[in-house]
Amino acid sequence: MKIQNINNNLYSDDVIPYLSTEKITHPKNFYENFTNALKKTSANERNIFDKINNSQIDESNSSLNDIMVDLQKISISIQFLVQVKNKLVESYQEIMNMQI
């Protein structure tokens, strides 16, 4: 079985317009990504609890549906961060158990 080269014209702009040649900026490292995700999750959590407190004081400001959706978003964000942390710990332990 012969392996052929990938044709660069396959992903031309006229075939798939959303693929562009613009330079994509990537975050510098994993630490920055993880701390940014923690900060965003923390800020979102504070915002939703402020929204809950304000809705208890002023009944007409926020609907219960919006609050429940926001709580689910926060829950998913926290679960994701916990899973990432668990994978990091698992990877660290695996590396530490490697023999040199």
From Swiss-Prot:
Protein family per UniProt: Belongs to the FliE family.
Q: Which gene encodes it?
A: fliE
Q: Name one GO biological process term.
A: bacterial-type flagellum-dependent cell motility
For the keyword Amino-acid biosynthesis, the answer is no
Q: Name one GO molecular function term.
A: cytoskeletal motor activity
GO CC terms: bacterial-type flagellum basal body
In terms of InterPro entries, this protein maps to: FliE
State where the protein is found: Bacterial flagellum basal body
What pairs make up the disulfide bonds?
none
The record lists the organism as Buchnera aphidicola subsp. Baizongia pistaciae (strain Bp)
State the source organism's domain of life.
Bacteria
Q: Per its record, how is this protein called by name?
A: Flagellar hook-basal body complex protein FliE
Q: Which UniProt keywords apply?
A: Bacterial flagellum
Q: What is its main location?
A: other
